[in-house]
Amino acid sequence: MTFNHKKMEPKWQQYWSEHNTFKTTEDKDKENFYALDMFPYPSGAGLHVGHPEGYTATDILSRMKRMQGKNVLHPIGWDAFGLPAEQYAIDTGNDPEEFTALNIANFTRQIKSLGFSYDWDREINTTDPEYYKWTQWIFEKLYENGLAYEAEIAVNWCPALGTVLANEEVIDGKSERGGFPVFRKPMRQWMLKITAYADRLLDDLDLVDWPENIKDMQRNWIGRSEGAEVTFKIKDSDETFNVFTTRPDTLFGATYTVFAPEHELIEKITTPEQKEAVETYKKQVELKSELERTDLAKDKTGVFTGAYAINPINGEEVPIWIADYVLIQYGTGAIMAVPAHDERDFEFAQQFGLNIRPVLEGGDVTKEAFTGDGPHINSEFLDGLAKEEAITAAIDWLEKEGIGSRKITYRLRDWLFSRQRYWGEPIPVIHWEDGETTLVPEEELPLLLPKATEIKPSGTGESPLANLHDWVNVTDESGRKGRRETNTMPQWAGSSWYFLRYIDPKNTEAIADKEKLIEWLPVDVYIGGAEHAVLHLLYARFWHKFLYDIGVVPTKEPFQKLFNQGMILGENNEKMSKSRGNVVNPDEVVEKYGADTLRMYEMFMGPLDASIAWNENGLEGARKFLDRIWRLFVTEEGILAEKVTTTANANLEKAYHHMVKTVTNHYENLRFNTGISQLMIFINEAYKQDSIPKEYVEGFVQLLSPIAPHLAEELWEILGHTETISYVTWPTYDETKLVEDEVEIVLQVNGKVKSKITVAKSLGKEELEKIAQEDDKMKENLEGKTIRKVIVVPGKLVNIVGN
């Protein structure tokens, strides 16, 4: 006998919708719980089975917390700006707005079919002008506080996409989306000064409960380095340049210096003999992406400028080279090379026959760089010193001589914030003919994205908005002409603050009401994929800290607990993708097995953070378990089974209380697979009984409800209840019922285990000895032996010594 999910699931989804069951309560006498999913990008492909894994996890927590008497905020929305919709629109001639609306409608249908307890009244969409009004407002505040600025910088220009890409969007010299070639090109761009928050972004990781590997990824991305900035003079010139080094103690081993090919001094210092070689090399470098330039495995390339610098610590002349592995945007765009103790410098020196001088004892620098630690040699006043002492002594000397100083640098760069695309938030800025730049007045926000029929990139580096002359060209009251900013914001903008808008999504006066922000922040649990470990999470933390500084939000950090669900792979253990043809559509699973089965299966596959292959057999197993529950409690006629009674059953008492305790604990700690195992153990025990107390059945159904809510609601109704199960008080357990009154005793002969027995915990030594001697297996092993000694450890063992 099986239940009819096709009838049952729509019935309860309609009930929840009509009764507004999951509307967020804001009862001042209750604690608040904010469970957040990483909101989806509504693609044309719709949901795949990977999406519901994280959504089910937050839904289980949300449903449990409601039953535990908390106000629960569990919202959903759409991260709907961005390249894919625009690319689709360009390829098909469709309007990205219409395409996005269709996709959202499809995603909404799919998500509702899975029974998630979202508060749909709080739905947000980053492309809604009432939403992006506040994205623009945040940008204006950043600008007013000196954290948004324009700069001419070398950017990753992708001609095929017609836009600039952030470093994070370039993989192996190609665009992350589409795999198109990417080139370096100087362009005017909007930047956000995330570097101003580097230390706080680093230090405040200690305030949050996040996976350590995600914290480490952020720490590495920020890349705080302590060292010294050292000034080198250029021979026969008044020019100087600075290098940053974490090892100023190795200055005596600096035998050459290297500039980034874009360094401003190159033109001034290159000798006539080297000019042609330098120009040729610079042109070659323009075609390389940052990743190609810094690839450790590639052959080293470079060219000598003909100029020399003076090593400030020993007065030696050292040649100045240019090489692509030095990047202008990192450090100072120039390095001192210590080939004896750095692998990359060593390879470069080997390639071009440059001097290699060891300054640390250890290794054979004729064969390879020695990168370990050892006492200093060939270093005058540093000789014999260990690393830390030598670093301190070197910096002290540099500062005393006025040619260097202690410095902290970061790997983190400012955030490249503009995109040369149409489908994004307009940047609310006007450039006037007299050179002034002003913000669109706050009362005129949102600055609406104009309708456009032709949204192909201009190809010049300007966005398609540049073609909309009526929108771009403006005149102020005094007749001064200006042009609107034509770049748009990146997709990261809307997702950097969306969790704040859920708290008060209809507010027209502010991002959200201040009191409500105090009530709900920080987010209690945030679940999503690890692929957002650096970018989204770093950007959201940056904006949150800025909003904290200007008094908008009450907390330093946005997300208290973060959890990354694993990836659901195809049956062949490969990532699901359209090209591989192994994508599983949840619609088909819901149609065949039901939403509760999909939810149960995805939570039972393994630990939530593990990546596991999809398996149809596992789905069938999950459905069989749900059918087993149904058959135990419900008759063929659809009424409550007779074995569900109001009488007590001592045989189930311990199993029930153990289940309540364990399942509650496992749900709280996101160990849903082991929680489900406990539900299975109880059902197995219940099948062995002639009667099951109704109280236990109700408690079981409540524990089941966060995972299989439709089935649980149906069973709850059959149990005689007229209200939804969603707010019934969560079951409690009695610790005294869990106390073991029996214990397993090991029986030994001459220290070797011969038998095991279960006895009352209260038995004393004499009774245990008697039982041991009467045990059949012990009798067999003691036959013909004289008992010399009996050792009894109550609650553990009886050992009979004989010969």
Curated annotation (Swiss-Prot):
Q: Which residues bind ATP?
A: 578
Instruction: Provide the protein's localization.
Output: Cytoplasm
Q: Enumerate the SUPFAM superfamilies for this protein.
A: Anticodon-binding domain of a subclass of class I aminoacyl-tRNA synthetases, Nucleotidylyl transferase, ValRS/IleRS/LeuRS editing domain
Q: Which domain of life is it from?
A: Bacteria
Q: Which InterPro entries match?
A: aa-tRNA-synth_I_CS, aa-tRNA-synth_Ia, Leu-tRNA-ligase, Leu_tRNA-synth_edit, M/V/L/I-tRNA-synth_anticd-bd, Methionyl/Leucyl_tRNA_Synth, Rossmann-like_a/b/a_fold, tRNAsynth_Ia_anticodon-bd
Motif 'HIGH' region per UniProt: ranges: 40-51
Keywords, comma-separated and alphabetical: Aminoacyl-tRNA synthetase, ATP-binding, Cytoplasm, Ligase, Nucleotide-binding, Protein biosynthesis
Q: Which family does it belong to?
A: Belongs to the class-I aminoacyl-tRNA synthetase family.
What is the protein named?
Leucine--tRNA ligase
| Species this protein is from | Listeria welshimeri serovar 6b (strain ATCC 35897 / DSM 20650 / CCUG 15529 / CIP 8149 / NCTC 11857 / SLCC 5334 / V8)
